[in-house]
Amino acid sequence: MSDVKKVVLAYSGGLDTSVILQWLRETYDCEVVTFTADLGQGEELEPARKKAEAFGIKEIYIDDLREEFVRDFVFPMFRANAIYEGEYLLGTSIARPLIAKRQVEIARETGADAVSHGATGKGNDQVRFELGYYGLEPNIKVIAPWREWDLNSREKLLAYAEKHGISIEGKQSGGSPYSMDANLLHISYEGGVLEDTWTECEEAMWRWTRSPEAAPDEAQYIDIEFQGGDPVSIDGEKLSPAALLSRLNDLGAMHGVGRIDIVENRYVGMKSRGCYETPGGTILLRAHRAIESITLDRESAHLKDEVMPKYAELIYNGYWWSPEREAMQALIDATQRRVNGVVRLKLYKGNVIVVGRDSANDSLFDQTIATFEDDRGAYDQKDAEGFIRLNALRLRIAQRRG
């Protein structure tokens, strides 16, 4: 079909990517290298290796990318307080650039001339993967099977798998009715009853978190320490980035934190309903904004809030490797040098409540000035009169004009 000789496939070992593996060999008569990323999705990855071996694959990559994922992708994003359309914490979006990066690296290591993914032609992930590929390797060949083949239903995929002797455990029954994606930051659910925007999902859908109703009746307090805008410890215990996010996930899940049910605007033009569990990320966002509230000056904080929606949109749409995202990241990171201190939070039945924040060396909160008691001349209230009159000048002129 083309002169493609070797393809690096993002491989999960599931139905879709197993069919893709066989289809690539059949259609392109090429060698396939499989790549499976451990991003903390909580799945056993050895079955993916065994399935690849059963296909006779000679080069199999299973990489533990959890620390890199949190350190180099999740934490930089949270320095920006990024939220897409007011609710989505970008758990799927932020994982794609790392997968694309590693695929390109493996292509270079193995001499592959193409990469392939299992994203459908209707979703955002095809865009995110491929913008990543081209942003890192401009001349790479990309194969997107869902845009080429006629296997456009689950029934056709199963028939193809059966025809070619592809083993798909549990393919006939017992599986989830939802399309799910998980990593250390979140788990997402789409499809099934969620395609009706009025129908509430069943409680059994949620895999990570307790319902707020079933969460403990007693609140739990935790302290999160930040250095340079990144969290470094929980309750005084220093943790690696991945271990810290995992701990926050456990704490948030126990207290029913981090569930959302939203309809979002996909980059490809349609609206899509999704449910997400992001327990650790929800806690982290609240804590980060709290430490910024005492360490960032007003204009820096407001500037960050102005650029954040565009930054979040870039990540959602797949432009992590773009020059504009990198420029915005440099601006954001420059604001974080003095974002140091500790935030105390109360977790209770789905709520994350900030109850304290402290920074020994970088706080801009001056109690002697802000107090309602006698400030001993630290703030001259008479100064406010001229400030108000100057700022009111344009309003008075406009009113006189009528």
UniProtKB/Swiss-Prot annotation:
Recorded GO CC terms: cytoplasm
Primary site of residence: cytoplasm
Protein residues bound to L-aspartate: 120, 124-125
Gene Ontology biological-process entries: argininosuccinate metabolic process; L-arginine biosynthetic process; urea cycle
Subcellular location: Cytoplasm
Pathway(s) the chain acts in: Amino-acid biosynthesis; L-arginine biosynthesis; L-arginine from L-ornithine and carbamoyl phosphate: step 2/3
Pfam families, per database record: Arginosuc_syn_C, Arginosuc_synth
Residues annotated to bind L-citrulline: 88, 93, 124, 128, 179, 188, 264, 276
Similarity remark: Belongs to the argininosuccinate synthase family. Type 1 subfamily.
PANTHER family: ARGININOSUCCINATE SYNTHASE
Subunit: Homotetramer.
Protein name per the record: Argininosuccinate synthase
Lineage: Bacteria, Pseudomonadati, Pseudomonadota, Gammaproteobacteria, Chromatiales
Chain's gene name: argG
